[in-house]
Amino acid sequence: SKFIGNPFSLAVHAGTDALHLALLLAGVKPGDEVISTAMTAEPTNTTIAMTGARVVWGDVNPRNGLLDPFSVRSLINERTKAIVVVHYAGMVCDMEEFNRIAHDFKIPVIEDAAHALGAKFNGQLIGSNSPYTLFSLQAIKHVTTVDGGFLCVGNQKDYEKARLKRWFGLDKTKSRLENDIQEVGFKYGMNNVTATIGLVQMRYLEEVLGRFISNGKYYDEHLKNISGVELVEYSKNT
């Protein structure tokens, strides 16, 4: 929460759990459609299928491998309930255009930022100013808790709903005798051991991000003049 600047953030057992919660908060139900991308790890789309919704793949921009917002606009219909964008390999999607689509069609955009902790768009950290953003803390991510993730939401209401759904629908600030479960929840909470690992890892985040950026620049520099190799085109304002 402190790093991203979003007080409505909560830790979960895995980034996949964070995506599932985001889809439920967005109101995705069986029979709905969710626009997504094939350029991602399997859980992005299998989690959509787990809600009973149909996955609709938008086109990928061949210059950067990211979901093309203009393709997405053409796929929206009365069954479309949400759009899932993936900031693949830390490269941020064209959120200016996706936010415009969200406004025009009143459809929420869910940001899969499993690869993008620390990435920015227009000077703002991803997750600081959007309705739903999920992050992964799995073993090979920038920060790891061995396995884990967290969800950032845009308001107190969604935060409270996610907090209850994260733990069987129970409010852990109350005793079991005081609880009255209103919605079914899950065992999606992060345990104290993995959380402690994550807190220590956060001390080194800037150093780790710097190393990733340095490695990326190294590859770009040494691959750019090789015949048949095309480098990715980074998004503007990222």
Predicted segment positions?
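Conserved coil-to-alpha-helix start sites within the AMP-binding
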Residues: 39-45
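PLP-dependent aminotransferase class I/II
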Residues: 7, 70, 82-86, 91, ...
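Aromatic/hydrophobic pocket-lining residues that form π-stacking "cages" and hydrophobic walls in ligand
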Residues: 22, 44, 98, 162
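Hydrophobic residues in well-ordered beta-strands that form the structural core
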Residues: 30, 36, 57, 109-111, ...
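Short amphipathic alpha-helical/adjacent loop interface patches that line ligand
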Residues: 16, 38, 69, 216
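Active-site phosphate-binding strand-loop segment of PLP-dependent enzymes
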Residues: 63-145, 150-152, 156-157
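Hydrophobic/aromatic ligand-binding patch that stacks against planar heteroaromatic rings
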Residues: 47-48, 101, 193
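Phosphate-binding glycine-rich loop
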Residues: 1-33, 47-51, 57-59, 124
